[in-house]
Each structure stands twice: as C-alpha cells, then as structure tokens.
UniProtKB/Swiss-Prot annotation:
Its EC number is 1.4.3.5. The keyword Oxidoreductase applies. GO terms for biological process: pyridoxine biosynthetic process. Pathway: Cofactor metabolism; pyridoxal 5'-phosphate salvage; pyridoxal 5'-phosphate from pyridoxamine 5'-phosphate: step 1/1; Cofactor metabolism; pyridoxal 5'-phosphate salvage; pyridoxal 5'-phosphate from pyridoxine 5'-phosphate: step 1/1. It holds the Pfam family PNP_phzG_C. This is Pyridoxine/pyridoxamine 5'-phosphate oxidase. It comes from the Bacteria. The gene is pdxH. Binds 1 FMN per subunit. InterPro entries: Pyridox_Oxase, Pyridox_Oxase_CS, Pyridox_Oxase_N, Pyridoxamine_oxidase_dimer_C, Split_barrel_FMN-bd. FMN binds at residues 55-60, 70-71, 76-77, 99, 134-135, 179, 189.
C-alpha cells in the first residue's frame, strides 16, 4: 500500500514560535474569506454546579495580554465568569478550514477601555445596553420595545453614559491551540501552553 500523501500549506504555521502573531495572521485571513463576522467566537463558561454553557460572542480586541469581549455583567455568562474567573473560546473559520481554541483565567477590562469601546458603538446599541435586562425573563417583545423607547427619550440629547453593569472581560490565555484541516483527517495541530499568563510559551505539535 502506498503511503498517504498530504498537501502542504502555503504558510507552514507549525513553525511559528509564538501564538499571537499567528492568530493575527489567521484573523486577517478570516476577514478576507468569511462572509459574516470573522471575529465571532464560541465562548464557554461553567455554572456553579460545573455545568457548561456556550454561546457566540464577538471578539473586540486582542493583544499579547489577551482576548477581549464585552457583555452585561449581570447576564448569565457575566455571572458565571465573575464566579469561576475562567473561560474558554473557540474560533472556527469554515471557509479556511481552521480553528483556534483559547483557555485561561479572565479579568475585567479597565473602565477606560470599556468607556472607549462603549462610546464607539452605534447609538442604538448603547440604548440597548440600558434597555435589555440580559438573560432575565421577558414578558413580551413590546416590553423590550417600551424600555428602548423610554431610554431613547431619556438620552435624547447628549452623550449616553455606559451602564455600570456593562463592561468587558479579557481572557488571559495559558493555552492556545491552532488546528488546520488536512486530507484523510491527518490534521495539523499546534498547542502553545504556559503555566501562567505571565509565563513563557511552550510549543507542542499534536497528533490529529
């Protein structure tokens, strides 16, 4: 039997020495090829009983300190993160046949960071942050629309302040895994790990 022949990648990511530059390159590739929301990511948290929850959020910033997203701290995910102080993310770009998994402790972003991002949002989204009691029971669509109308009237003139319960989280990764599809399920996997968010990265290539 002849050995399985594998196609080569145009850019051999398995040679990358650190994860953040590689992630930036992959995200830029996704921005060119994904039809919708290349920064969409599945965010996993756990409740007090250890039962996991997962939902899609949007990555809003990243650098060598971590991956940032924003939410209502009083929402279910906000409460679970504040309790566990840990989370995981999974990016999947179907058009590129690539995946990135991120795990680590979570910290709040600074008020200055949250204020700057909140101010950049469309006015309607800022109103929505006040009107929505995220994750709580909603009696009807009309009740939500009424709340939106009330806050629209309240902030009809001038700036809209950021709600005290609305801010961001930063996952400070201790594990980042890159996955690329290959024929016959002989995929490429590279795992970067470090003992703490301040530590040096160790790199391992993994069996598919």
């Amino acid at each position: 039997m002849e050995p399985v022949k594998m196609t080569n990648s145009s850019d051999d990511f398995t040679q990358s020495a650190e994860p953040f530059k590689l992630f930036a390159e992959w995200l830029a590739d996704a921005a060119k090829s994904e039809p919708n929301d290349p920064n969409a990511v599945a965010l996993a948290t756990v409740d007090p009983d250890g039962l996991p929850n997962v939902r899609m959020v949007l990555l809003k910033d990243f650098d060598e300190t971590g991956f940032v997203f924003y939410t209502n701290y009083e929402s279910k995910k906000g409460q679970e993160i504040l309790s566990a102080e840990k989370a995981a993310m999974c990016f999947h770009w179907k058009s590129l046949r690539r995946q990135v998994r991120v795990r680590g402790p979570v910290e709040k972003v600074s008020d200055a960071e949250a204020d700057a991002y909140y101010a950049s949002r469309p006015r309607g989204s800022r109103i929505g942050a006040w009107a929505s009691k995220q994750s709580r029971p909603l009696e009807s669509r009309f009740a939500l629309e009424k709340a939106v109308a009330e806050y629209t009237a309240k902030y009809a003139i001038g700036d809209i302040p950021r709600p005290p319960y609305w801010s961001g989280f930063r996952i400070r990764p201790v594990s980042i895994e890159f996955w690329h599809d290959r024929p016959f399920r002989l995929h490429d996997r590279v795992l970067f790990t470090r003992p703490t968010p301040e530590g040096d990265w160790n790199k391992d290539r993994l069996y598919p």
